[in-house]
Amino acid sequence: MSNIQLIVGLGNPGLEYKYTRHNAGTWLVENLARMHNCTLSLQSKFFGYTGRVTIGGQDIRLLIPTTYMNKSGQAVAALAGFYRIPPESILVAYDELDLPPGIAKFKLGGSSSQNGIRDIVSSLGNNKDFYRLRVGIGHPGHKGKVSGYVLGKAPAKEQEQMDAAIDEGVRCIEILIKDDMKKAMNRLHSFKAE
């Protein structure tokens, strides 16, 4: 059984970003909240939308920061600090360029080139020991095209693949919390949306 106490979905605030690839983490937390009939409410002291769900008898807080992606650490540190949630009890969902659409993977710790993750690491005192759920969005093929790509909307087929991977990610979060990381990883890492 995992000791996850906080699940964070990264993205950018505002309608202009709502359906962009960069908001894949936000979509995942919104789906998780919907699945548990949880209404997320704006909490200015936590710089984001928050909610609470119970999964496998565990009380879990949900957070979608209202800061821009590169300032996500402000929200995570505020909520984790207030509730005394250690980094190893945090799971952050975010978009991953290095995975194709339709794939999602868990990861524990380590570095990342993703700006939101880097800011969270910095805001947690350079502690990298939190869980990640990386939602594949694919790569545009050239480094110079990344910004426009992540801030763009995916074609319908890719969006369907990302949505399927997010749905599977939500199911695997339940397995992670009720059982363990190995079982959740085995299932999620063998999933590929067609």
Swiss-Prot record:
This is Peptidyl-tRNA hydrolase. The record marks N12 as: Discriminates between blocked and unblocked aminoacyl-tRNA. GO terms for biological process: protein quality control for misfolded or incompletely synthesized proteins; rescue of stalled ribosome. Pfam families: Pept_tRNA_hydro (PF01195). Transmembrane segments: none annotated. Its EC number is 3.1.1.29. Belongs to the PTH family. It is found in: Cytoplasm. PANTHER family: PEPTIDYL-TRNA HYDROLASE. InterPro entries: Pept_tRNA_hydro, Pept_tRNA_hydro_CS, Pept_tRNA_hydro_sf. The lineage of its organism: Bacteria, Pseudomonadati, Pseudomonadota, Gammaproteobacteria, Alteromonadales. It is an enzyme of class 3 (hydrolase). TRNA binds at Y17, Y68, N70, N115. The gene is pth. It comes from Pseudoalteromonas atlantica (strain T6c / ATCC BAA-1087).
